[in-house]
């Protein structure tokens, strides 16, 4: 301490220190008394002691000051507010596939995605489009349209699609299914989905979905018309009842539908099917009183009734009277059930006929390409526009997309106890094997780290110590970790009574020690004959480790190595204060 006091009181030593270290040596002692006080000489060593501990306090004060100044720095930087430049996002391109009779741009005028992203509408028919789709580049659409006698050629990447036109019609020789495939290849979202648009390119395929609903709900809730499918003309021999309605291929607006009154006409139409080289369906003719149409646009429902005035069996041919009827729960069930097919239909309609005997028959379902009828056509178009904007807000804006839930973490299970974790056993009161007696034969065992025991379990074998009492000649008692009362009871029992429970507990509860076989563990209590008296005072964990290490070591070379280590530490400590 005298060396430290002289060294720390040296002015040259303080001058050579970096800035911020030991500033208290150069400050006057505030707690010292007046010069006339006789207690000054007695308190003279106190400034030295304070100066000795001043590096830690000065470092702590410097760190505290830095921590106090840290939150003030950002506030100072934030004082001059900088104007944030608004980020103008590019407008989203909406491709509406429809004819030129409806100008869809006016229905999207003023509408924005999430209220801040504009929508640019591009409208064209399937016949005016071409495209190229890429795996990573999306879909590039080429459009060539004629507006007011002017040909417009444009290329763009659409962000969303509204399909309002049929992609396939055999009657008009229109097949644009390849364009639907290209749009799907580019991963473009649409209303309705491109998956459903492609599936609606075959009416028998759609009718098969109605059959599933029919079997699910039953004929009372979902009255589906009886229909028969023929892949070609060969199986078309006769019909069970007449008159029948024959539908050839895939067509719209009543095209390809023929009413057959008798067997002779049926055979004639079979030859027409052979020339058409397509499939055909037959269904019983229903003498209808009126037609029913239930449409669904998003969450809006409407039901219409159409009655033929001209008397034609096709209600869409000639004169007809159309009126809106009440939306019943029966109609709602029909359209809701059909809207679930092909992954969901945002826009759909169900067509049915009401016979003169008062029964209903569902004959067809339509998708987003359905024609709009009635007095609320403008309202329906506005509903479609609102539905598209809602879908665009959900699918195109990253902030509106909801991520998928993360898989919850499973319950953490405790890992299996590795051999290296056996060192924690003494700290938890687990029994450990004692070392072999001095002078006895050493058992073959692998090198393992020193182990410690609790003070009540430690039994040491000092060098040259002889047995003191006959009780110490019994084998060491081993007990389970959760029975401290057993250790106290067995400590005062006879050797014979203590050896029996220890043998049973060691054979069932204690795992094998590293480097020892099971047979060696069973023979250990018999080979050990050297006494290990109890310690009369408790020891700290450091003393336990050192004494256990001494009992396991047994060679003087390790003592010399420890002494050499202590000497090296002393030299290192002395070099810190040397010149």
From Swiss-Prot:
Residues 531-579 are annotated as: E. The modification Phosphoserine is found at residues 9, 454, 461, 469, 474, 480, 483, 540. Residues 550-566 have a biased composition (Basic and acidic residues). Pfam families: Synapsin (PF02078), Synapsin_C (PF02750), Synapsin_N (PF10581). PROSITE patterns: SYNAPSIN_1 (PS00415), SYNAPSIN_2 (PS00416). Residues 1-28 are annotated as: A. Keywords: ATP-binding, Calcium, Cytoplasmic vesicle, Membrane, Nucleotide-binding, Phosphoprotein, Synapse. Residues 486-529 have a biased composition (Polar residues). Residues 399-530 are annotated as: J. Phosphorylation at Ser-9 dissociates synapsins from synaptic vesicles. GO terms for biological process: neurotransmitter secretion; synaptic vesicle clustering; synaptic vesicle cycle. Residues 28-90 are annotated as: B. It is a peripheral membrane protein. GO terms for molecular function: ATP binding. Residues 30-39, 47-66, 418-431, 453-485, 536-549 have a biased composition (Low complexity). Regulated by calcium. Calcium inhibits ATP binding to the C-domain. The A region binds phospholipids with a preference for negatively charged species. May be involved in the regulation of neurotransmitter release and synaptogenesis. Binds ATP with high affinity and ADP with a lower affinity. This is consistent with a catalytic role of the C-domain in which ADP would be dissociated by cellular ATP after bound ATP was hydrolyzed. Belongs to the synapsin family. This is Synapsin-3. It comes from Mus musculus. The gene is Syn3.
């Amino acid at each position: 301490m005298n060396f430290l006091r002289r060294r720390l009181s040296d002015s040259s030593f303080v001058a050579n220190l970096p800035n911020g270290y030991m500033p208290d040596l150069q400050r006057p002692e505030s707690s010292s008394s007046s010069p006339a006080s006789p207690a000054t000489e007695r308190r003279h060593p106190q400034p030295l002691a304070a100066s000795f501990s001043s590096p830690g306090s000065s470092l702590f004060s410097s760190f505290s000051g830095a921590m106090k100044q840290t939150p003030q720095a950002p506030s100072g930087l934030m004082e001059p507010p900088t104007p944030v430049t608004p980020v103008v996002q590019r407008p989203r391109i909406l491709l509406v596939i429809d004819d030129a009779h409806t100008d869809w741009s006016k229905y999207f005028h003023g509408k924005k995605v999430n209220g801040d992203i504009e929508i640019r509408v591009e409208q064209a028919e399937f016949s005016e489009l071409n495209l190229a789709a890429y795996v990573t580049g999306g879909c590039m659409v080429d459009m060539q349209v004629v507006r007011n006698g002017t040909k417009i050629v444009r290329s763009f990447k659409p962000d969303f699609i509204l399909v309002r036109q049929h992609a396939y019609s055999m009657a008009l020789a229109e097949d644009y299914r390849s364009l639907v495939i290209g749009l799907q290849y580019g991963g473009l979202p649409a209303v309705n989905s491109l998956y459903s648009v492609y599936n609606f390119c075959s009416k028998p395929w759609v009718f098969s979905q109605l059959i599933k609903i029919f079997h699910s709900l039953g004929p009372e809730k979902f009255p589906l018309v009886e229909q028969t499918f023929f892949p070609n003309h060969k199986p078309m021999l006769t019909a069970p009842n007449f008159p029948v309605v024959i539908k050839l291929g895939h067509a719209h607006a009543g095209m390809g539908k023929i009413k057959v009154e008798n067997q002779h006409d049926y055979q004639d139409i079979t030859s027409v099917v052979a020339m058409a080289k397509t499939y055909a369906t037959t269904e019983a003719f229903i003498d209808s009183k009126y037609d029913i149409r239930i449409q669904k646009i998003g969450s809006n429902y409407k039901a219409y009734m159409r009655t033929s005035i001209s008397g034609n069996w096709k209600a869409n041919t000639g004169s007809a009277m159309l009126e809106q009827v009440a939306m019943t729960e029966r109609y709602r069930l029909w359209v809701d059930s059909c809207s679930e097919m092909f992954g969901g239909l945002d826009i759909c309609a169900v067509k049915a006929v009401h016979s003169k005997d008062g029964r209903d028959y569902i004959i067809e379902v339509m998708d987003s390409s359905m024609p709009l009828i009635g007095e609320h056509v403008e309202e329906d178009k506005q509903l479609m526009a609102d539905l598209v904007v809602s879908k665009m807000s959900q699918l195109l804006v990253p902030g509106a997309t909801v991520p998928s839930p993360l898989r919850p973490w499973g319950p953490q299970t405790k890992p299996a106890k590795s051999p290296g974790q056996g060192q924690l056993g003494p700290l938890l009161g687990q029994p450990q094997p004692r070392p072999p007696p001095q002078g006895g034969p050493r058992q073959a065992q692998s090198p393992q780290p020193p182990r410690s025991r609790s003070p009540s379990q430690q039994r040491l074998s000092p060098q040259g110590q002889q047995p003191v009492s006959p009780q110490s000649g019994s084998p060491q008692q081993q007990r389970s970790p959760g029975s401290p009362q057993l250790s106290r009871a067995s400590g005062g029992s006879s050797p014979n009574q203590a050896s029996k429970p220890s043998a049973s507990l060691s054979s069932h509860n204690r795992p094998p020690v590293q480097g020892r076989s099971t047979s060696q563990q069973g023979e250990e209590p018999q080979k050990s004959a050297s006494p290990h008296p109890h310690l009369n005072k408790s020891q700290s964990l450091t003393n336990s480790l050192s004494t256990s290490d001494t009992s396991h070591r047994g060679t003087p070379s390790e003592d010399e190595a420890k002494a050499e280590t202590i000497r090296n530490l002393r030299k290192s400590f002395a070099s810190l204060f040397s010149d």
